[in-house]
């Protein structure tokens, strides 16, 4: 078995799987390492559903989303498999976020529609907002079939010659005479490039970062309708993916149809509690992560039972100081070491675009999408 590679990708979540696939696709001999068994639920990439959307308050995200769509369309064609469902995105806000998104989408020529809060209920009877709210509909928004994305990128990676080792723990990485080495509990590999896509474990492998990385424990809540006869209003054919921002309260929520658990839609508070315990087994069920969605549902979603969630799952966000991704080199590290991380709860949809950009960087090429906005050079050294 070979121990010499062009690229070793550490971490086989969605960022790592997309990165490894794109590296191998452009001719880089690539090894993908995962500390847990494939299919584990210890990080940020498990579950059946995620949101995809062009709509963003920062225009720098839009082209990454477009690149991700193109890759998914290609995989659907190659595999003959449906990897997402176009439901449309409903973005509602009490502040001026809708205007920001409208400006960005107009600049990029992306089809969308701005509506008044009072008009939302006419489109989607699940909701009832007053004129203090504004809405935007992104028709290309939809449900990512998250588990299928992971399997697709890993399968295609292996089909074109990529190697995956799961249950293999990286112990260290080093540089000797301009060569990079990765030492695991099973072997030692040499590589021209190392790409870390390790989620909340980033500080384990890069402990000397000059800025703070914050892992967050998230409670993912699911809710049913008050009356079973209305349960169809929560399925993919009737329920959009949703971003809801109460800007006056600084409370942000997101929601998806009942893809994960039929009859129960996903509706979650977008933040959680700092994760200080075992990263693989985060604490969950912080009461505010239940109370805040419940309060919103009771106030704005008349057909949904907001008394208590039907189920609570766990997930981990990894946040950078400004909640944007980190893509590329780290100023204090060897330039042949790259990082793709800090998805901050929104990175799944752009993982194919991030993976392609990292692969192009590893090959010494100009990136198809400008990702300079996500460079770690934007951070000043932390005082902590």
From Swiss-Prot:
Q: Which residues carry this modification: S-8alpha-FAD cysteine?
A: 315
Top-level lineage group: Eukaryota
Q: Which GO terms describe its molecular function?
A: flavin adenine dinucleotide binding; L-pipecolate oxidase activity; sarcosine oxidase activity
The residues that hold FAD are: 6-36
Similarity field: Belongs to the MSOX/MTOX family.
Q: Which organism is it from?
A: Caenorhabditis elegans
- Please share the entry's free-text remark on the cofactor: Binds 1 FAD per subunit.
Q: Which InterPro entries match?
A: FAD-dep_OxRdtase (IPR006076), FAD/NAD-bd_sf (IPR036188), MTOX (IPR045170)
Q: What is this protein called?
A: Putative sarcosine oxidase
Which Enzyme Commission number(s) are on file for it?
1.5.3.1
Catalyses which reaction(s): sarcosine + O2 + H2O = formaldehyde + glycine + H2O2
**Which EC class is this protein assigned?**
oxidoreductase
**Cofactor names:** FAD
Q: What does UniProt give as GO cellular component?
A: peroxisome
| Annotated GO biological process | L-lysine catabolic process to acetyl-CoA via L-pipecolate
The residues that cross the membrane are none
């Amino acid at each position: 078995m070979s121990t010499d590679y062009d690229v070793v990708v550490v971490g086989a979540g969605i960022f790592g799987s997309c990165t490894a696939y794109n590296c191998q696709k452009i001719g880089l001999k690539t090894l993908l390492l995962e500390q847990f068994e494939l299919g584990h639920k210890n990080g940020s990439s498990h579950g059946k559903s995620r949101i995809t959307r062009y709509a963003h308050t920062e225009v720098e995200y839009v082209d990454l989303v477009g690149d991700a769509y193109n890759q998914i369309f290609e995989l659907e064609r190659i595999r003959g498999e449906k990897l997402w469902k176009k439901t449309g995105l409903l973005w509602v806000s009490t502040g001026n976020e809708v205007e920001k998104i409208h400006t960005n989408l107009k600049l990029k020529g992306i089809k969308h529609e701005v509506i008044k809060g009072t008009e939302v209920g006419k489109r989607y009877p699940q909701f009832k907002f007053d004129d203090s709210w504004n809405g935007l509909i992104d028709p290309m928004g939809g449900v990512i079939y998250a588990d299928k994305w992971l399997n697709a990128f890993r399968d295609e990676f292996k089909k074109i010659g990529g190697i995956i080792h799961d249950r293999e723990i990286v112990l260290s990485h080093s540089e000797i005479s301009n060569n990079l080495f990765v030492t695991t509990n099973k072997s030692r590999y040499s590589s021209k490039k190392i790409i870390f896509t390790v989620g909340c474990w980033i500080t384990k492998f890069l402990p000397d970062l000059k800025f703070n990385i914050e892992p967050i424990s998230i409670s993912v809540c699911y809710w049913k309708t008050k009356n079973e006869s209305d349960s169809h209003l929560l399925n993919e054919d009737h329920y959009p993916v949703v971003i809801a921002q109460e800007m006056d309260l600084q409370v942000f929520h997101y929601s998806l149809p009942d893809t994960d658990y039929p009859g129960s839609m996903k509706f979650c508070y977008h933040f959680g509690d700092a994760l200080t315990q075992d990263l693989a087994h985060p604490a969950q069920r912080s009461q505010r992560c239940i109370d805040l969605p419940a309060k919103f549902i009771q106030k704005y979603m008349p057909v949904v039972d907001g008394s208590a969630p039907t189920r609570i799952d766990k997930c981990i966000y990894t946040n950078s100081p400004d909640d944007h991704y980190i893509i590329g080199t780290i100023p204090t590290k060897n330039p042949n070491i790259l990082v793709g991380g800090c998805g901050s709860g929104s990175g799944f949809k752009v993982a194919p675009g991030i993976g392609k950009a990292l692969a192009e960087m590893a090959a010494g090429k100009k990136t198809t999408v400008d990702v300079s906005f996500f460079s770690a050079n934007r951070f000043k050294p932390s005082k902590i």
